[in-house]
Regions:
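Terminal interaction modules at protein C-ends
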Residues: 1-24
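Active-site beta->alpha N-cap acidic-glycine motif
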Residues: 18-91
């Protein structure tokens, strides 16, 4: 029993040391895929963390998610469907920006999606590995964003995407995702990625992380949000 108590005490001290460690820097967290399921969105908004929420247009709960997010004083974004390298993997059908569309078609689809979610402050890409690496397509999308005063975050679903570069050249406020937090649905894996993002922000001064409006992700954030808030990041 004494050995067990000693091990528990050592483990507690180790956890306390991590919690007490002070970090510096800024971490921006974007919650993607809002609109499919409202429950994780509610749970995340109720954490009162300064997350940004990227909402897919035209889904069953898109409007409800927007209402919950804005009602909670959080930042709402459009999660704009864009063409992936493999069209057969395209999840959003006719609302997706395609690289073989004319500039006018791209702008029309982009405006329609933006208008469907009044009050959004910015846009990031859903899928889009092919579209975000196509300069002409990105220029057409970003022209609309510039006209409407919206920022653009390149989700970095493809290492050769140029969305943020094109945005910068056009004077559109922009940034690029640095890390995905929930490629695994295991809560412990997600928590480990959250701390990896915190350390990245501390090391570089800032970082952007993307995760998704899913039950396991919401549960993971619920377990660590107080520690992250207390970490100094």
């Amino acid at each position: 029993k004494e050995d067990k108590d000693i091990k528990e005490d050592e483990s507690t001290k180790k956890d306390d040391k991590k919690t007490a460690q002070k970090y510096h820097g800024k971490l921006a967290v974007i919650i993607d895929d809002c609109g499919y399921d409202l429950a994780p969105v509610r749970k995340l908004v109720n954490l009162n963390a300064p997350f940004s929420y990227a909402i897919l247009p035209y889904k069953d709960f898109s409007s409800d998610a927007l209402h919950v997010i804005k009602g909670g004083g959080q930042t709402a974004m459009l999660h704009l469907p864009m063409e992936p390298m493999d069209r057969t993997a395209m999840s959003e059908g006719k609302s997706t920006i395609l690289t073989d569309m004319t500039a006018e078609q791209v702008q029309q689809l982009t405006r329609k999606a933006v208008d469907s979610l009044p009050g959004i402050e910015g846009v990031n890409n859903h899928q889009g590995s092919k579209a975000t690496s196509n300069e002409a397509t990105m220029k057409a999308v970003l022209k609309v964003l510039k006209q409407q005063g919206l920022f653009f975050v390149d989700s970095s679903t493809y290492s050769k995407s140029i969305g943020d570069q094109v945005a910068r050249s056009m004077g559109v406020p922009t940034a690029r995702n640095n890390i995905f937090l929930d490629n695994s649905s295991d809560e412990d894996d997600i928590i480990a990625k959250i701390w990896q993002a915190v350390e990245m922000a501390d090391r570089n001064g800032s970082a952007i992380a993307i995760c998704h409006a899913r039950p396991h992700t919401a549960a993971a954030w619920g377990k660590v949000i107080d520690e992250v808030n207390a970490s100094g990041i």
